[in-house]
Amino acid sequence: MTEKIYKLLKDSPAMRWTALVLLASAMFFAYMFVDILSPLQAMLQETKGWDPAAYGTYQGSETFLNVFVFFLIFAGIILDKIGVRNTALLSGALMVIGAYLKYWAVSDGFTGGATDEYLKNFWNFFPFYEGMPSSAKMAALGFMIFGCGVEMAGITVSKGIVKWFKGKEMALAMGLKWLSPVSVLQQPY
């Protein structure tokens, strides 16, 4: 009786740890991008006319859809339905789209355009308010989309680690995964 022995990539320690480094790096850079405009608050107030309320609304928008629309629950359902690889691609796409909108909103290309004019008088209800600069509204919309991608990526990375490290060094891998967001907190601004 001949048995075929299948060796999976996750059976190789080098591949498992490479996967962990890639997953943790993705989360590290995602969390870095969450705080990227924090040091620029004063500049945004001067150049774009953002008041502290507009900046606070923008900064809080990252979690808005995850908390008030329960997107994180939907992200978990999506993860269970389409798997780790496809959910990772979807969360990455959401982060790229959200990051682009956020960048566009604070760039000179947004100022004076049709979208700028449209947003000045549109959507003056929760979470936005009347008089909020349109660049802050667009940045907040982009940040909401980015936040959906980040939180979806967070649960996807956790499930990916479970998949790659099942029966092996899972506790160590999870600890190292959580080291990447903590290291962001240690970054000097």
PLM segments and residue spans:
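Small-residue-rich segments within alpha-helical transmembrane domains of MFS-like 12-TM solute carriers
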Residues: 31, 35, 131, 135, ...
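Glycine-rich segments within core transmembrane alpha-helices of 12-TM secondary carriers
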Residues: 171-189
